[in-house]
Amino acid sequence: MTTSFARNVPLADYTTLGLGGPAARFCSVASTDELIATVRDVDRSGDPLLVLGGGSNLVVADEGFAGTVIQVDSSDLSYTEVDDTVVRVRVDAGMEWDSFVARCVDEGLSGVEALSGIPGRVGATPIQNVGAYGQDISQTVVEVTVYDRAADRTRVLSAAECGFAYRTSIFKGRDRYVVCDVVFELTRSKLSRPIRYAELARSLGVSQGDQVPLADVRDAVLSLRRSKGMVLDPADPDTRSAGSFFTNPILSADEFARFTQRVAEVLGPEVTPPAYPDGDGRVKTSAAWLIERAGFPKGYGTGPVGISTKHTLALTNRGGATTADLLALAREVRAGVARVFGITLVNEPVMIGVTL
């Protein structure tokens, strides 16, 4: 098995932000075996390694990456019937995520329909426990096959071993594991899982908890995402982003009480901030709400970067931007929210060669 490498490949061409300097070496792999063999060879050489999927959740330094970048293009898929209603689907890391979701909807497999339209590839989804519109990966993942670089062997990790939490897992922020494939447990049904997200329920004209045809959910989610610039469109600069740039803060009960008091002081006692129970007494609030009320509306920004005109959480490359430009805006927003509300926002995209 021989993998060919290109040199000084601009990573801007491989990220949805359209930002990032060159990779010293770059290759694509088409199978899990080739992925593991190439990672092993790079590790033995001592070269820094970056494993790349769809580049949709990535912020790369203007200086690029002084090592080897492996783009994962493996795309095999197989089914195992558990019983008459339950199917396990094993999907290679390199398959386009939305192609997988579309296939599930077409074949009457319920469980990922609300995750339609999310850019990127399957291998990235467990890393940050991708979620939207009331569904997330942890609800359907059974196991993840990884190459353990430290032990030089493949391992199969159960969902429990993946350590899933809000937009994170044991994989995020660590380069020990390379995701090879993911197994999802889905339900044979023409109907969706119960609709949990209020905005999606309103769009569908149903109540939360109702089930509707899979295709209806997919169409509604795609429509909602397009309205927010969250479906890639080369003609729309608002889609040239890394999706949501900041995660929604999760606060302890004491932190939320202090935050509520701060909101009353700043915005008035009649203003109630968004609050969603998150277990163990914790409360999740809205990063978008914080950003807008700290003085950063949709469309904020001048020059080549700005906040999307459709979605407050998306920071966009309007054309001709650099990663330094993007980070300057992100830091301005983060500092503004901290100054007004005392909450420090956390970035959702993975940072390569830069920090916020």
From Swiss-Prot:
**Pathway linked to the protein:** Cell wall biogenesis; peptidoglycan biosynthesis
Q: Which reaction does it catalyse?
A: UDP-N-acetyl-alpha-D-muramate + NADP(+) = UDP-N-acetyl-3-O-(1-carboxyvinyl)-alpha-D-glucosamine + NADPH + H(+)
EC number(s) recorded for this UniProt protein = 1.3.1.98
Q: InterPro entries, from UniProt?
A: FAD-bd_PCMH (IPR016166), FAD-bd_PCMH-like_sf (IPR036318), FAD-bd_PCMH_sub1 (IPR016167), FAD-bd_PCMH_sub2 (IPR016169), MurB (IPR003170), MurB_C (IPR011601), MurB_C_sf (IPR036635), Oxid_FAD_bind_N (IPR006094)
Q: Which organism is it from?
A: Thermobifida fusca (strain YX)
UniProt-annotated catalytic positions: 167, 244, 348
Q: Which cofactor does it need?
A: FAD
Q: Where in the cell is it found?
A: Cytoplasm
Gene designation: murB
Keywords (A to Z) from UniProt: Cell cycle, Cell division, Cell shape, Cell wall biogenesis/degradation, Cytoplasm, FAD, Flavoprotein, NADP, Oxidoreductase, Peptidoglycan synthesis
Domain FAD-binding PCMH-type per the UniProt entry, residue ranges? 19-227
Q: What class of enzyme is it?
A: oxidoreductase
Q: Name one Pfam family in it.
A: MurB_C
Q: Can you say what this protein is called?
A: UDP-N-acetylenolpyruvoylglucosamine reductase
Which family would the database say this protein is a member of? Belongs to the MurB family.
Extract one GO molecular function annotation from the record: FAD binding
Q: Which GO terms describe its cellular component?
A: cytosol
Domain of life of the source: Bacteria
> According to its UniProt entry, what is the function of this protein?
Cell wall formation.
Q: Name one GO biological process term.
A: peptidoglycan biosynthetic process
